[in-house]
UniProtKB/Swiss-Prot annotation:
An annotated GO cellular component: nucleus
Coiled coil, from the record: 373-400
Record keyword Thylakoid present: no
Region of interest (Interaction with TOR1A), residue spans: 368-595
Region of interest (Disordered), residue spans: 1-221, 250-286, 319-340
Entry keywords, A to Z: Coiled coil, Glycoprotein, Isopeptide bond, Membrane, Nucleus, Phosphoprotein, Transmembrane, Transmembrane helix, Ubl conjugation
Family per record: Belongs to the TOR1AIP family.
Protein name (record): Torsin-1A-interacting protein 1
Subunit structure, interactors included: Interacts with ATP1B4. Interacts with TOR1A (ATP-bound). Interacts with TOR1B, TOR2A and TOR3A. Interacts with VIM.
Organism: Mus musculus
Ranges of Polar residues composition bias in the record: 133-143, 204-215, 319-335
Lineage summary: Eukaryota, Metazoa, Chordata, Craniata, Vertebrata
A molecular-function term among this protein's GO annotations: cytoskeletal protein binding
Amino acid sequence: MAGERWQAEGPGEGWAIYVTPRAPIREGRRRLDPRNGDSSDAPAYGAHPSRRGRREVRFSEEPAEVYGDFEPRAAKERSPGGRRTPPEKFRPASAGEEVRESAYNLRSRPRRQRRAQEAEEMKTRRSARLEQHSQQPQLSPATSGRGLRDSPSSSEDREEDEPSSRPVTSQTASKKTLRTPEASVMNEDPISNLCRPPLRSPRLDSTYQTNGNTKTNEREATIVQQVNFFEEGETEDDLESSYSDITIRARSSDSLESRDEATPAAGNHPDSLRGLPHNQDFPAHENQPLLLTSGCQENPQEWVDRAVRMRSRMAYNNIQKSNFGNQSPSTSRPQSAIHHPNEPSVKIKWWLLGLVAILAVGLFWFFHTPAVETTAVQEFQNQMKQLQSKYQSQNEKLWKRGTTFLEKHLNSSLPRPQPAILLLTAAQDAAEVLKCLSEQIADAYSSFRSVRAIRIDGAGKAAQDSDLVKHEVDQELTDGFKNGQNAAVVHRFESLPAGSTLIFYKYCDHENAAFKDVALVLTVLLEEKTLEASLGLKEIEEKVRDFLKVKFTSSSTASSYNHMDPDKLNGLWSRISHLVLPVQPENTLKAGSCL
């Protein structure tokens, strides 16, 4: 049978006597080829007759010792004599065996009994190594709790009685030695390196499951290997030479997977993995000294202190890493936002600062300009009150309507929509009052700027050429307004040449005027000797219009672009007649002087 041991060969065969051959292939009943579409386990049609069909393999709960269709691993190792041992041939099955199915269960082989000489030699080496380390002081419970799983005496009994079918020893039976620096770093106890790990229930180990995780098994098998197994005939030199040929895999091939994969392994080996970080591996290098060897050369007390420090440092690092791993992304994002300021926030702050500056300038301009205008209006009102106190014979409508009209123009927003045009008229008895009052009203308008109003005398230009007068009037008004003067007075408007008056289209054309922030005061002296005070403003306006029409238009004057005609006069009148106010004579006014 597959589980029975074959008889040993001659003494020269070496390890071949301990090789368990693969179970023989038993032939059952032959099956017909699936020619008609039926499915069976028979070989395909046309296959070679010597090729047997596939077998169904069922795995038992015990670890498997048969490795499929290849040779046993022990058969590939070299024998002590230096030659390779050929694999054993399987003996034929007896005729009386009953072939039930083309399936069988894989069973672990029974442990072999050591020969007396071999067991005595291994005990001698082990006892010598135990005596070498028995002089070291006893470790603290915290130190020995992780490293010493069993006492040295129990480890011997466990090594003798433990089945050889453990996954760790069965997978590495062909190795000369297994010296793991990782186990030394984790346990840091020289005595624990001589102790075999405790027996584990084969039902709880995922290595024995057919659908188990091979990555976890590989990690477990690597970490559990803490004992140095010495084969027959090897020496200490062989151990040191074979140390450089072994690479310990402390983690699975895919170590970047989630930590949940490493948690079950840590549960199976709590003493081995508790102090080891998940993402830390310890590859064994050729020049790296063993912790056990260095510990034997140093003082035992120093070695114990170093082991305690290394263990506490590894535990502290593991706590830090676990805390960082358990931190949620929502907690880590605000920290990164604190260390690294957000650039859009800085830009928004700069934009806000610029906006505040613009608003400050706008508010300053908004509040400053009305304050200036308010001061100008107040100054104008004060001047008009003084004039009203001086010229007491004037009609109340003159002060009320004139002050309101010019004050409204001063309060209008900048730029103002149109200039302020005021026309004053009087009879022959109030000629001196008309001249003085018109100039003082214009000066009151520009009193805030402390400048004198522009003065143009029409009576002095009556005999001059119309074009020349027009040019002179235009030049005086333009220069004065450009130089900061905002008021002008034109005396004796009716005395100007008729054609020259067309220049006032430029300065009085409402929204199309050349200068809109100015005030013009025009005076017209009627031919009548006295002007009745009972006349209304409408009647006075008609009197002035009819007088200018007679003055500027005549049938003998040729019609041309530079000569006045009724149509042009009507257009000019509509532009200069915004407000027409009468002026009455003053008894206190002396000739040649103003009040």
